[in-house]
Regions:
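Conserved Nudix-box catalytic region and its N-terminal flanking loop in Nudix hydrolases
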Residues: 1-29, 37
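Beta-rich nucleic-acid/ligand-interaction surfaces
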Residues: 41-61
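Secondary-structure boundary elements
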Residues: 28, 32-46, 73
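Nudix hydrolase/Nudix homology domain
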Residues: 2-12, 57-140
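Intrinsically disordered, low-complexity boundary segments flanking structured domains
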Residues: 36-38, 51-53, 79-85
Length: 140
């Protein structure tokens, strides 16, 4: 599974209109540090779509879940990650899966420890619609 998880930092992620942190700046930083993606060359902040909000009551943490559409092929991302990125240790591996409901559902259902199920579900519904995604999932 590949994810970008970053803590929001006021000084590091400060927006351009004041001292408040900017969630898009935080996401851009995470994409750079964990996957080696460069803003402007590989994506823009406008390519980031936040899809849902989550809260861990056990750890008193909140999270924004979303997707980003990048201008790179998956082989470019894997090669960049393999060559070393700042926070490579935060992901154990990158397992490319075609982004279709069928391929993603097959992957998720064969990897029981897969922890991004809610995020993946929201991303699939965003791209393909709830009815289609639910029908694919129901076939398992």
């Amino acid at each position: 599974e590949t994810s970008v998880v970053e803590g929001l930092s006021r000084p590091t992620d400060r927006g351009t209109h004041g001292d408040a942190p900017d969630i898009y700046r935080c996401a851009c930083r995470g994409l750079a540090e964990e996957l080696g993606l460069r803003e402007s060359a590989d994506f823009s902040a406008a390519d980031i779509t936040f899809l849902s909000f989550g809260v861990s009551t056990q750890y008193a943490l909140w999270a924004l879940r979303g997707i980003v559409k990048i201008k790179r092929d998956v082989s470019d991302v894997v090669a960049r990650w393999d060559n070393g990125v700042k926070d490579k240790f935060e992901n154990q591996d990158i397992l490319p899966v075609p982004f279709t409901p069928q391929d993603v559902a097959s992957f998720v259902f064969t990897h029981q420890s897969f922890s991004l199920k809610p995020t993946i579900y929201h991303a699939l519904v965003h791209e393909f619609g709830r009815e289609h995604v639910d029908a694919v999932i129901a076939s398992y």
